[in-house]
């Protein structure tokens, strides 16, 4: 699928601050099984050409490698899963560094199938790069790795 060079217009409240855009990113992918996500909202958060980069290997969990996706590639990857499974992801800790119009956020997350599940089925860390164009924040890329037995989340990220 060809990559769009133009992102849809965003709700100004979603992109007015780093807090707002991170919240919108988590909210846009969360919902019950079978519920259509607001992909317009999701796309509106990302700078044209942005990348979403999960680190892992479904076949071999110990052979980690980045899987570089554009926004539409990410949506195509997760839609079948979201059709069958509830997915609620929320941020549980954050470290932010900013210089001028660029920012880096370490965002620790946990995922549940239902919002009231007592324990998450997954946790991990997102490395999020952001850019402010003078009027709004954009996500340039999100690069993440799930926690596993070999790679527990360090205390400094909790």
Give the residues covered by each predicted segment.
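Surface-exposed, charged secondary-structure patches
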Residues: 51-52, 56-116
């Amino acid at each position: 699928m060809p990559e769009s060079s133009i992102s849809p217009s965003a709700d100004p409240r979603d992109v007015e601050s780093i807090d707002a855009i991170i919240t919108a990113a988590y909210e846009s992918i969360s919902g019950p099984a079978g519920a259509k996500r607001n992909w317009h909202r999701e796309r509106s958060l990302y700078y044209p050409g942005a990348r979403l980069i999960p680190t892992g290997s479904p076949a071999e969990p110990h052979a980690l490698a980045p899987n570089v996706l554009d926004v539409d590639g990410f949506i195509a990857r997760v839609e079948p899963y979201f059709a069958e499974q509830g997915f609620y992801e929320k941020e549980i800790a954050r470290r932010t560094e900013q210089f001028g119009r660029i920012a880096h956020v370490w965002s620790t997350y946990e995922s549940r199938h239902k919002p009231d599940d007592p324990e998450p089925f997954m946790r991990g860390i997102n490395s999020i790069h952001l850019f402010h164009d003078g009027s709004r924040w954009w996500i340039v890329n999100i690069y993440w790795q799930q926690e596993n037995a070999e790679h527990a989340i360090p205390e400094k990220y909790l």
